[in-house]
UniProtKB/Swiss-Prot annotation:
Disulfide bonds join 47-55, 50-60, 54-65. Residues 25-45 form a propeptide. GO terms for cellular component: extracellular region. Residues 1-24 form the signal peptide. It comes from the Eukaryota. It is found in: Secreted. Keywords: Disulfide bond, Pyrrolidone carboxylic acid, Secreted, Signal, Toxin. The lineage of its organism: Eukaryota, Metazoa, Spiralia, Lophotrochozoa, Mollusca. The modification Pyrrolidone carboxylic acid is found at residue 46. Expressed by the venom duct. It comes from Conus amadis. This is Conotoxin Am6.8. One of its GO terms (molecular function) is toxin activity.
């Protein structure tokens, strides 16, 4: 189960790195929140966007994400 979660997180991170930041991150805050909710588990401490440096640092902190 843990391996599956790790693999899924890794896959999402790799997919996001293949996109440009402008494509990966919506500018509208509500869209961005919906996207976060869809791809993230609530108990994760890092979000893929922060890991690939694609979301604004202020949004990362507000959403509870911790940059690496």
């Amino acid at each position: 189960m843990i391996r599956m979660g790790f693999f899924l997180t890794l896959t999402v991170a790799v997919l996001l790195t293949s996109l440009t930041c402008s494509e990966a991150v919506p500018t509208d805050k509500r869209e961005m929140e919906r996207l976060f909710d869809r791809i993230l588990l609530k108990d994760q401490r890092q979000c893929p966007y922060c890991v690939v440096h694609c979301c604004p640092p202020s949004y990362c902190q507000a959403s509870g994400c911790r940059p690496p």
